[in-house]
Amino acid sequence: MSTNQTKSSQGAKKGTRNIIITGGAGFIGSHVVRLFVNKYSDYEIYNLDKLTYAGNLANLKDVEDKPNYHFVKADICDFERVYALMQEKEIDGIIHLAAESHVDRSIKDPFTFAQTNVMGTLSMLQAAKLYWESLPEKWEGKRFYHISTDEVYGALEMTHPAGVEPPFSTKASSGEHHLAYGTKFFTEDLKYQPHSP
């Protein structure tokens, strides 16, 4: 068992923010994890990653021994595991980056893409909803950030009505549509949409 997996079995520390970053061993996710681990030493960062073709813990060698970094090997589609982690670590923030990527792979294996990008996002939302709803303060101070891709809507002009180009974008946009479900119970609707040049 690695040091990080041992550390992840400890209970949550009081007085800190406890944040899950999904897909934290991926290219973009590892940069987000590194930023949070180094910038917010009072936050406990839980890198939840399945370690598929896109995930590589070597991306995080420089932070793996930091006391506020914890690796959790798990699948975002495993609702029970995600929900248990949220309860055990008293999670109050989620940065959701985990997703199947690469358009070519979506053509070869559309079911895996749909399972991860659609049902995985729904699993994360539902775990957050149920856990945060059970707390006395409910959703106060809680945050769920879903990071997506510019491929959701394909090659559209910014003024074009939303549309999708299958198959990759269909699965990615389905995950985004589940966020409409999330706005029914989260108190704030914070949106940030990066654009490719």
Where are each of the predicted segments found?
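N-terminal Rossmann-like NAD(P)+-binding domain of SDR-like oxidoreductases, especially those catalyzing
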Residues: 2-197
